[in-house]
Structures are given as structure tokens and as C-alpha cells.
Amino acid sequence: MQIHLVFVGKTVFPDVETGIERYVSRLNHYLPTRIHYVKAEKIPPRGMESAVLEKECERILKLIGGKSNQLIVWDRTGKHLDSLEFARVLERLSNGGTGAVWMIIGGPLGISRELRDRANLVLALSEMTFPHDLARLIVAEQLYRAFTIIRGEPYHK
């Protein structure tokens, strides 16, 4: 199985980018993991948000094309899982012969309805709102944590 992390827009804070890269490097010991960046649109005037989300959605769908075996979208409206439940989801996907898992973290306006509807799973990080850079770091860390749980390694306590 491969993991593809799709981020809308660039990571702003270099220290956060370093943290994301560190977790992705650790993840690569378990399975191939790649980060893909999709261009973010500028924040539009009020009432034009859906047009921006549609453009970003088009870019994401062009990137993943027909390659997506599993699409997981991170969105505030998603399901809440703890780390053990998230590990079980990934373990089922891995054991089920899933070739690739595409995980999408949207930009400042979130994720389009079309992407949420296409997703096999919509997950939320928290009831709280996080900066997108921090959300990316949390997802990368939780992926690493999940695979240490699956392997029975001592990282997760």
C-alpha cells in the first residue's frame, strides 16, 4: 500500500514543514509515502467560496485521476477516531490489498462537497480549528503513530 498526502497550498512555516518531512521519512520505513501540493486559490470575496473550492477540487481530481483506490478526506464535518481506531482503519486497508490511499487536506476554505461525496471516509481531527500547517503535521504524526501501533512498536503509549 502507498500513502499519498495531498495538501492544498504550500506549508507556510519552515519548522512545521521540517516536522512533516520527518514523519514522512519515518513512514517510508513502513510503506511508500509521498506529499503532493496542489495550488491554492486566493481567498475570494464573500459569496464566491464555492467557485474557489471547485477549482481546487478540479486540481485534486486531476492529480489523483483514476488512481485512487481509497480516498480519505480530512474535514471538520468528518468522523472522529482515536489513534487506535485510525490504526485499525489503515490496517484493514493494508490487509485488504488497497494499492493506494489518498489523504486530502484542503486549504483555508476547506474541502468541496464533491470531494467529500467521493471520499471513502471523511475524518475530522478535532472539534477545534487548527491552522492548516498544524493539521498537516498532526495527520503526518498520526499516520506514523498508526503504523507503530499496527507493528506493535513502543512509540504509542
From Swiss-Prot:
It catalyses: pseudouridine(1915) in 23S rRNA + S-adenosyl-L-methionine = N(3)-methylpseudouridine(1915) in 23S rRNA + S-adenosyl-L-homocysteine + H(+). The gene is rlmH. GO terms for cellular component: cytoplasm. S-adenosyl-L-methionine binds at residues 106, 125-130. GO terms for molecular function: rRNA (pseudouridine-N3-)-methyltransferase activity. InterPro entries: Alpha/beta_knot_MTases, RlmH-like, tRNA_m1G_MTases_N. Keywords: Cytoplasm, Methyltransferase, rRNA processing, S-adenosyl-L-methionine, Transferase. This is Ribosomal RNA large subunit methyltransferase H.
